[in-house]
């Protein structure tokens, strides 16, 4: 969408992960300081082979996440994690609250907005509480990285690094009920006996436990928005900025509601 901007260029804050020159700038292979992007990139300068295959990435062993947490001791997966980490974390949410909310946390603030972690934040998901990609309450405990078996414990261990497709043929060597990527949703370890989403089913795949928890979270958000914030809310994963005012308070996204002018504003 930067084609329509003036000037038409990939901005500094986006160039690292949306262009080869931007990523090389971040790595410092262009002679600039490593760790930051100094210049916008040209439209059309997409990610090419040299972005991930160069002298800097060959020796990269650590990655710093938006929370400030640094994960070290990495291998080839480090080059993936530099971009598949999101752009926000617990830290950014807490900073926004501290800056824009008074002592009464339930008071709507016109200075608040939805903080989007950004897209495909797989590395933040993988490392859990170690990097705090999702919001963490200070008095709660959260899971860290799940240690898989040797050889399948990194991004590139389970995914083709170029197509991003899961290596299903490798998965089914141990997960014998897996024939296709859709079957991955049915995986559940024998020791997982907790009914996380409270639906009474402890045999469903962990994917479905998480999906159930997501439904419960959405219901809680909608209840809070209607009862405390005073403005009903709906969510549409396919339309920016994703959260919208539920104008008829029916709990569903209806025609005309998922539009930017109707973005939710009672945070």
Each model region followed by its residue ranges:
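Sequence context of c-type cytochrome heme-c attachment sites
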Residues: 1-78, 82-160
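Structured mid-domain segments that build the active-site/substrate or prosthetic-cofactor binding neighborhood
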Residues: 150-189
């Amino acid at each position: 969408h930067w084609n329509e901007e003036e000037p038409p260029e990939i901005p500094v804050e986006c160039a690292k992960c949306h262009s080869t020159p931007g990523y090389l700038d971040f790595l410092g292979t262009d002679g600039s300081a490593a760790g930051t992007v100094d210049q916008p990139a040209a439209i059309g300068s997409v990610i090419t082979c040299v972005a991930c295959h160069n002298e800097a990435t060959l020796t990269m062993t650590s990655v710093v996440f938006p929370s400030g947490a640094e994960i070290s001791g990495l291998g080839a997966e480090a080059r993936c994690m530099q971009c598949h980490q999101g752009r926000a974390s617990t830290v950014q949410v807490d900073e926004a609250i501290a800056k824009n909310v008074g002592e009464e946390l339930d008071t709507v603030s016109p200075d608040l907005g939805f903080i989007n972690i950004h897209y495909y934040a797989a590395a933040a998901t993988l490392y859990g509480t170690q990097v705090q990609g999702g919001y963490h309450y200070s008095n709660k405990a959260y899971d860290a990285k799940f240690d898989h078996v040797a050889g399948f414990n990194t991004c590139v261990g389970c995914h083709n690094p170029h197509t991003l497709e899961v290596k299903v043929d490798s998965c089914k060597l141990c997960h014998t009920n897996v024939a296709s990527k859709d079957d991955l949703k049915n995986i559940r370890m024998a020791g997982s006996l907790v009914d996380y989403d409270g639906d009474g089913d402890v045999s469903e795949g962990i994917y479905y436990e998480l999906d159930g928890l997501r439904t419960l979270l959405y219901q809680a958000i909608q209840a809070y928005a209607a009862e405390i914030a005073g403005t009903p809310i709906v969510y549409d994963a396919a339309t920016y900025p994703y959260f919208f005012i539920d104008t008829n308070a029916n709990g569903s996204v209806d025609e005309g509601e998922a539009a930017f002018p109707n973005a939710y504003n009672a945070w």
